[in-house]
């Protein structure tokens, strides 16, 4: 049977569609949220995060740009996974941070590290790995306004690392650029964020 260029395109269409669905998940509207929230500029992130992290606290899902309470997020997430696919191999790293310390208007201690997990084997279980910095939920001073809590996932350059060499000595003034330099990582391959406030 002779295949014309048109018939080849028809044969390839289902495969191409599924690939696009995995990689286009954070298209322009999603990158707009990262930009308008100020996270891209405040953390010097790329304009577009190619993947979205699905984060759950029990039955509660983190909705990007949504709001949760400190009580709802007091314990570590029960699930963090990537929606879609990436072009790097394990292991992976996950961080959660608050860039609004002590407040968004006066972030003199940007950022505070709330969680760090290294040497993760699967993008479907980014919460399972070597815990370099134990989880600490949102607990900012009452009256400091809404804080952004940001999850970011990175490739580790195909090598496992020692948590003692990567974890910072303190949570405050966490230098994200220094972190992925030590990790030999590039830009984050996925992220999510929510707001929380102590009334």
Residue ranges of predicted features:
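N-terminus-centered regions that define maturation/targeting leaders and the start
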Residues: 2-199
């Amino acid at each position: 049977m002779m295949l014309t260029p048109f018939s080849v395109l028809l044969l390839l269409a289902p495969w191409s569609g599924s690939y696009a669905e995995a990689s286009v998940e954070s298209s322009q509207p999603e990158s707009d949220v990262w930009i308008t929230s100020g996270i891209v500029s405040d953390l010097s992130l790329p304009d577009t995060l190619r993947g979205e992290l699905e984060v759950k606290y029990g039955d509660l899902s983190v909705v990007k740009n949504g709001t949760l309470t400190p009580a709802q997020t007091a314990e570590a997430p029960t699930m963090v996974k990537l929606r879609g696919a990436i072009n790097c191999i394990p292991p992976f790293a996950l961080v959660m941070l608050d860039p609004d310390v002590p407040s968004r208007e006066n972030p003199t201690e940007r950022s505070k590290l709330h969680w760090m997990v290294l040497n993760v084997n699967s993008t479907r279980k980014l919460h399972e790995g070597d815990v370099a910095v134990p989880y600490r939920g949102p607990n900012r001073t009452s009256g400091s306004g809404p804080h952004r809590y940001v999850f970011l996932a990175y490739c580790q350059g195909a090598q496992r690392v020692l948590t003692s060499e990567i974890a910072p000595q303190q949570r405050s003034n966490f230098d994200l650029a220094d972190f992925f330099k030590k990790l030999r990582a590039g830009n984050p391959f996925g992220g999510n964020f929510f707001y929380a406030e102590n009334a």
